[in-house]
C-alpha cells in the first residue's frame, strides 16, 4: 500500500505552457502544473516540498539577519529609533535588549549578536533546503514515514496541526520566560518614562484576559488592542501558550469528528487556503495593534501613535500658553468650545480642539496628570514635569501621518516631505499584506472547493477556438 503514496495524481487543472520542459520528473506532463506554478508541482512530492519550505525559511531568516545587521551598521545612538527608519531594532529593544531608562540604547552588541545568529541559522536552513530540493528523497513516506503524509489522510493532517500548535505555544512561552526570568522586557509605563523590568505579578485571571476578547472594537473599548499593561500581555501569553500546547496535544491524540470530516475540504490546496485566511486575520490585527497600541509597541522605539502625537501637540501648546499667562481652564477656542480643555459628553475633562476625537488616548507621559474625572486642572497647573514636556514636544513633531489628509489638528509642513514613522510602515504593510493574503485565501479556497466537487477542468487546450482562427498578421 505504501507505493500508493508516491503515485503522482494528474491534477484536473490544465495549465498553458510548454509541456515539453522537463525538470527531473517535475514537469507539466507528470504533475499537471507548469514550471511557473511553483510549488504546485511538488504537491505529491513530500521530500521536494520539504526542500522548498526549508529554503523559504532560510530566505526569511537571511533577510532578518541581514536587515538586522544593516540597521545596526546604520544606527545612530543619539537619535530615536523611529527617526532612523528602523523596523527590527525596535522589536529587539522592546524585548529589553540593549536599552535602559527612557528607552535609551546603552549597548548595541545584543543587536549585532541577533543579526549574526540569524545569518548562521539561515545558512543551515539554506543548506537543508538545497539538500532536500536537489539531493534528498522525492517522497518521505517510504523512508521516513513519521515525516510522510497523504493530503487526504485526515488523522495525519490533524497530527501535523497539533505539532504546529505545540511549537506556537512554545514560542508564546519563550516571551513569558524572557519577561519573567531572563532580564525582563521594556515597560513604557515604568515610573519616570519607561525602563526594562522583570514582570513579577502576572495577570492570569480568565475574566480579565478573555474580557479583552469580549470588548467592543470601537473607541474607548478597543478590543484586545486596548491592552495597556505588561502584566496582562505576558499573562495573555501564558494563557495562549497553554491553550496552543493543550490543543496541540489534543489534535495529535484525536481524530477529526464526523462533522469536521464532512464540513472541511481535505486537500493540500484547501489547507493552503485555511492558512492564508488565518495569516490574513493576523495581518489585520497586527495593523491595528501597531497603529494604536503604545504598550506592546512602545512609542520610545516606534514613535508615537497618531492619537498620541495629536494629544501631545495639544499638551505642548497648553504648557506654552499657560506659561504666557493663559487661563487654560476657561479659554475659549474658535468654535466656542474650550481652547485647551473641555468636557466630553460624559463629563470627563479632555483636551480641546481637533484632538478631542482622541480623548481616549492613554500614554505614559500623560496619565500622571489625570484625576478621577479626566485631566486634573490643578495637576496641569502645578505638576507638569520637564520630561513630560520634552517627550510631548518630541512626539508632536513625529506623528505617524505620512500623507494622511485628516491629521487630528497636528501641524504639518505644506511644502516639504513630512516625517514617515515606522508605525506607518508597519501598519500599512500589514494591512496591505493582510488584504492580499485574504485574496489568496479566496482564490485557493475556490479552487480547492471546485476540485473537491470535481468540476474544475479549465479550458481544453487542444480544441480551444483560438487555435482555428487566422493569425493577427
Swiss-Prot record:
Principal cellular location given in the protein's record: plastid
Gene3D superfamilies linked to this entry: photosystem ii from thermosynechococcus elongatus
Cofactor note: Binds multiple chlorophylls and provides some of the ligands for the Ca-4Mn-5O cluster of the oxygen-evolving complex. It may also provide a ligand for a Cl- that is required for oxygen evolution. PSII binds additional chlorophylls, carotenoids and specific lipids.
Gene Ontology biological process terms in this record: photosynthetic electron transport in photosystem II
Keywords: Acetylation, Chlorophyll, Chloroplast, Chromophore, Manganese, Membrane, Metal-binding, Phosphoprotein, Photosynthesis, Photosystem II, Plastid, Thylakoid, Transmembrane, Transmembrane helix
Membrane topology, record value: Multi-pass membrane protein
Residue ranges that the Swiss-Prot or TrEMBL entry lists as coiled coil: none
Binding site for [CaMn4O5] cluster: 367
Sequence positions bearing Phosphothreonine: 15
Disulphide-bonded residues: none
First and last residue of the signal peptide: none
Modified residues (N-acetylthreonine): 15
Subunit composition and interactions: PSII is composed of 1 copy each of membrane proteins PsbA, PsbB, PsbC, PsbD, PsbE, PsbF, PsbH, PsbI, PsbJ, PsbK, PsbL, PsbM, PsbT, PsbX, PsbY, PsbZ, Psb30/Ycf12, at least 3 peripheral proteins of the oxygen-evolving complex and a large number of cofactors. It forms dimeric complexes.
Stated role: One of the components of the core complex of photosystem II (PSII). It binds chlorophyll and helps catalyze the primary light-induced photochemical processes of PSII. PSII is a light-driven water:plastoquinone oxidoreductase, using light energy to abstract electrons from H(2)O, generating O(2) and a proton gradient subsequently used for ATP formation.
UniProt-recorded name of the protein: Photosystem II CP43 reaction center protein
Species of origin: Lactuca sativa (Garden lettuce)
Higher taxonomy: Eukaryota, Viridiplantae, Streptophyta, Embryophyta, Tracheophyta
Amino acid at each position: 500500500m505504501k507505493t500508493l503514496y508516491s503515485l503522482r495524481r494528474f491534477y484536473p487543472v490544465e495549465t498553458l505552457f510548454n509541456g515539453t520542459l522537463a525538470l527531473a520528473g517535475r514537469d507539466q506532463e507528470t504533475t499537471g502544473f507548469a514550471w511557473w506554478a511553483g510549488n504546485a508541482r511538488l504537491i505529491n512530492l513530500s521530500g521536494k516540498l520539504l526542500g522548498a519550505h526549508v529554503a523559504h525559511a532560510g530566505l526569511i531568516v537571511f533577510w532578518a539577519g541581514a536587515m538586522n545587521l544593516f540597521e545596526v551598521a546604520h544606527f545612530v545612538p543619539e537619535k530615536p529609533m523611529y527617526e532612523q527608519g528602523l523596523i527590527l531594532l525596535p522589536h529587539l529593544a522592546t524585548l529589553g535588549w540593549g536599552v535602559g531608562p527612557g528607552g535609551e540604547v546603552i549597548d548595541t552588541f545584543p543587536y549585532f549578536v541577533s543579526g549574526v545568529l540569524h545569518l548562521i541559522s539561515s545558512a543551515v536552513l539554506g543548506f537543508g533546503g538545497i539538500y532536500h530540493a536537489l539531493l534528498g528523497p522525492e517522497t518521505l513516506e517510504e523512508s521516513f514515514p513519521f515525516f510522510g503524509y497523504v493530503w487526504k489522510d485526515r488523522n495525519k493532517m490533524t497530527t501535523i496541526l497539533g505539532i504546529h500548535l505545540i511549537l506556537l505555544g512554545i514560542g508564546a512561552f519563550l516571551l513569558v520566560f524572557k519577561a519573567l526570568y531572563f532580564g525582563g522586557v521594556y515597560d513604557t509605563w515604568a515610573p519616570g518614562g519607561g525602563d526594562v523590568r522583570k514582570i513579577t505579578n502576572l495577570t492570569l485571571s480568565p475574566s480579565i484576559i478573555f474580557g479583552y476578547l469580549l470588548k467592543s472594537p470601537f473607541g474607548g473599548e478597543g478590543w484586545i488592542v486596548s491592552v495597556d499593561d505588561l502584566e496582562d500581555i505576558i499573562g495573555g501569553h501564558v494563557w495562549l501558550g497553554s491553550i496552543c500546547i493543550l490543543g496541540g496535544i489534543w489534535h495529535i491524540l484525536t481524530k477529526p469528528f464526523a462533522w469536521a470530516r464532512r464540513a472541511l475540504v481535505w486537500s493540500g490546496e484547501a489547507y493552503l487556503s485555511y492558512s492564508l485566511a488565518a495569516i490574513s486575520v493576523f495581518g489585520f490585527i497586527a495593523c491595528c495593534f501597531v497603529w494604536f497600541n503604545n504598550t506592546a509597541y512602545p512609542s520610545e522605539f516606534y514613535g508615537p501613535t497618531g492619537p498620541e502625537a495629536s494629544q501631545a501637540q495639544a499638551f505642548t501648546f497648553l504648557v506654552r500658553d499657560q506659561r504666557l499667562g493663559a487661563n487654560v481652564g476657561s479659554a475659549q477656542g474658535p468654535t466656542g468650545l474650550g481652547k485647551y480643555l473641555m468636557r466630553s459628553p460624559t463629563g470627563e475633562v479632555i483636551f480641546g480642539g481637533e484632538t478631542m476625537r482622541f480623548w481616549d488616548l492613554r500614554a505614559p507621559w500623560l496619565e500622571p496628570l489625570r484625576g478621577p474625572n479626566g485631566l486634573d486642572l490643578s495637576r496641569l497647573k502645578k505638576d507638569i514635569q520637564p520630561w513630560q514636556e520634552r517627550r510631548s514636544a518630541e512626539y508632536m513633531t513625529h506623528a505617524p501621518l505620512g500623507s494622511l489628509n485628516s491629521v487630528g489638528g497636528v501641524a504639518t509642513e505644506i511644502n516639504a516631505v513630512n516625517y514617515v514613522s515606522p508605525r506607518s510602515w508597519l501598519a500599512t504593510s500589514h494591512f496591505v499584506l493582510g488584504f492580499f493574503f485574504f485574496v489568496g485565501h479566496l482564490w485557493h479556497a475556490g479552487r480547492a472547493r471546485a476540485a473537491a466537487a470535481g468540476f474544475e477542468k479549465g479550458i481544453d487546450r487542444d480544441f480551444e477556438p483560438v487555435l482555428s482562427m487566422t493569425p493577427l498578421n
